[in-house]
Amino acid sequence: MKKILFLFVLGFGLIAFSACTSNPANQEAPIGENSNNPVDTAINNEVAPVLIDGSYVVDVNASQMTWHASRVVASDHTGLIQIKNGNLDVSEGNLMGANFIIDMNSISSDEGLDALVGHLKSEDFFDVANYPEAFLEINNVTYLDGAYQITADLGIKGAVSSITFPAQITTEADRLLATAAFSIDRTVWDIRYGSGKFFEDLGDKTIKDEIDFTIQLEAQRQ
């Protein structure tokens, strides 16, 4: 679990997704479909670092995405998810847009819990048989309080919703490095298993709705 972060984090009972999301749109969307609308890039009275212009391709072997989820009582789980591919565009020194495909079938457990991994892949959670990929598409970038503020569409299980999170992004020669962290409310993406919002009398088997993700990205300029 490694370098430029746009994480994505997911969990047991998985499951926790802290409401950074808005406008849930339970609409089927082609995985990783890019919109043709230009990304809104604004620099709010702060001078953003000047990035090196170019098209960057994510180095999936040098990048890492982690997830963390827990029950309401005493049970925390963490693991990795593989970024399948990704692209970032920098123009006039600013990040103009990016998109990433996430391999949901690659979900793993740091504890090596095969039963947990199997459950996360099942229909109760990510239903990877029918939805093997998720996507993150950046459509708005601002710079505030020493960090890039990223707004992106996150697609999981055919549902798409907007999330906003801070990120650190730098370029060095032909490399782009990024780190990010965000939380989501999994129920927005119709992942309801063990949620106290939808089921009563779960007691200590209740799984938190929030899932935390971290991303460390490294990308190569083409």
Placement of each model-derived feature along the sequence:
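Low-complexity, acidic/polar, glycine-enriched regions of mature
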Residues: C20-Q222
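Hydrophobic helical h-region of N-terminal Sec-dependent signal peptides
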Residues: F6-L14
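Positively charged n-region of N-terminal signal peptides that target proteins for export
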Residues: M1-I4
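C-terminal motif of bacterial Sec signal peptides marking the signal peptidase cleavage site
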Residues: I15-A19
